[in-house]
């Protein structure tokens, strides 16, 4: 039919002819619009996921608040007070006038010294604690800390040795959550065993213990220390590189560690039976000095940025996999809608947009079911149960919609392949982009091959 005949036709007939002529383009546009609309239920599922994550985080917080939170161990640090002469300017009233005068006064300051050598050896015994359906990893850690301080020197501050208050020296250790300490804490320093009491003596850190030390003097060459502690915590353990040279060894039966922080282990062994890790760190990788005065507070951000240690990851974080799978939801919808559209093109079957909508909603419900099932079962089991239910629903519906059991069987096989393809992508975290791209090229090649002989203009004009 040429353009002259179209122009001579009545308006109503003309509209029908145009709709018929561009029916394929219109159908493709409707499918594209429907795909975009299905992003709405997918976003709603994503919103439900965020809500469940918030509930999980709240449950984990309740567990850790009673057992022990993520622990960071910093110290010990030696604190020695001293007296010095300080000149300041102060406003004084003289003869009813305010004058600014120089005042010389004796003030008290504290000097902080970090150890020259710091060693830590520990073992973490992990287990899972539940709050309802939610679980978090907690551990009981046995740590042995040792090392030595160099002889404290006040020369850089020009302090008179006679003004150093050696008899008021203190030793301080920062432990993030002291609720995790399961027994009394003691430290052996300079040959004497002292008990540690709660009190935060270090700036820029949270929580800590300290003790008064007697017997220190300016004639000591080196001050050794050693202590053992049993510490409850959850999910992670960190150390601060407080020594000039730091040597830390950790072992555990947890099979899925994640080594985090400013320094990675110099050596590690990870297997299904657990892990062993060994750090050798110098003080060059941190931003705070080896000694300072209390009028130069340590930067808390700088301290945290140089910490190192290990996270005890859950063996399988189902929420993480569900979140990744939802990101592929639009791909799943496009692939299945492409298959339905090809059935329309290659056969006389016509599929109504409402039927496309029902199939799309079924695909979206798969992700909601996956989220619900993954909270009570492993992700793999939840995925394939959800995939089986979704495939069964869509297949039975397709048999009627496509008016053929054979075509419904093709849809079933296609869905199984698509779900298997997405599952492989989810499991292959490092190579998911490569495998996913290769799969899309394969799908595009199949579509191009199947439609290679279609004369689209002739089909619309038929």
Where are these regions (language model features)?
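N-terminal Lys/Arg-rich, disordered targeting/topogenic segments
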Residues: 1-20
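Alpha-helical transmembrane signal-anchor/signal-peptide segments
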Residues: 44-70
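Hydrophobic alpha-helical transmembrane signal-anchor segments
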Residues: 20-47
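Generic detector of multi-pass transmembrane helix bundles and their immediately adjacent loops
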Residues: 330-462
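Cytosolic-side membrane-insertion boundary helix
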Residues: 23, 302-333, 352-353
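Soluble non-transmembrane domains of integral membrane proteins
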Residues: 54, 58, 65, 79, ...
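Glycine- and acidic
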Residues: 42-46, 315-326, 424, 428
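Short extracytoplasmic
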Residues: 61-89
